[in-house]
């Protein structure tokens, strides 16, 4: 198995507590409301905390697909969230799992700094393709921007 690590950083004008609430606490409800392609996020096992398995159902290229997320950490006090994509048809054939470690911190002018570490655990000697990485980054950025946009458009959300 190979492990390939990628780091990302973004800034937001939204305060970290509010952004964490949208990205983590309320994500199962908000994400399908603000992103048309995401149809549902439902718990299939667990209570929402570490060990919980969630099924994210989405439409891509006219087909309904899903991925399974395993929650590994939810730290509301420190605005941190770790999870892995562990299954589903949205997971590339050459990848065993993709792990995400996300952390928000206070940024300039009351906003946030978002840091994300992504690890691809590949099967055998497989290497994630540039296309897989590019598509994964684009999807992640799209979700981040959509939920950030929701917070900006709804200033009473907190």
Swiss-Prot record:
One of its GO terms (cellular component) is nucleus. The keyword ATP-binding does not apply. It comes from the Eukaryota. PROSITE patterns: PATHOGENESIS_BETVI. InterPro entries: Bet_v_I/MLP, Bet_v_I_allergen, Plant_def-hormone_signal, START-like_dom_sf. PANTHER family: OS08G0374000 PROTEIN-RELATED, STRESS-INDUCED PROTEIN SAM22. This is Disease resistance response protein DRRG49-C. The lineage of its organism: Eukaryota, Viridiplantae, Streptophyta, Embryophyta, Tracheophyta.
């Amino acid at each position: 198995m190979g492990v390939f690590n990628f780091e990302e950083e973004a800034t937001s004008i939204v305060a970290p507590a509010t952004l964490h609430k949208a990205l983590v606490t309320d994500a199962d409800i908000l994400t399908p409301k603000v992103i048309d392609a995401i149809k549902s996020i439902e718990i299939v096992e667990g209570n929402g905390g570490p060990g919980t398995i969630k099924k994210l159902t989405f439409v891509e290229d006219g087909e309904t697909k899903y991925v399974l997320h395993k929650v590994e950490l939810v730290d509301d006090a420190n605005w941190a969230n770790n999870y892995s994509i562990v299954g589903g048809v949205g997971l590339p054939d050459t990848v065993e799992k993709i792990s995400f470690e996300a952390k928000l911190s206070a940024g300039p002018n009351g906003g946030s700094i978002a840091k994300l570490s992504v690890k691809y655990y590949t099967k055998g000697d497989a290497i994630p393709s540039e296309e897989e990485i590019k598509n994964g980054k684009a999807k992640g950025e799209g979700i981040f921007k959509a939920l950030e946009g929701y917070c900006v458009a709804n200033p009473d959300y907190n």
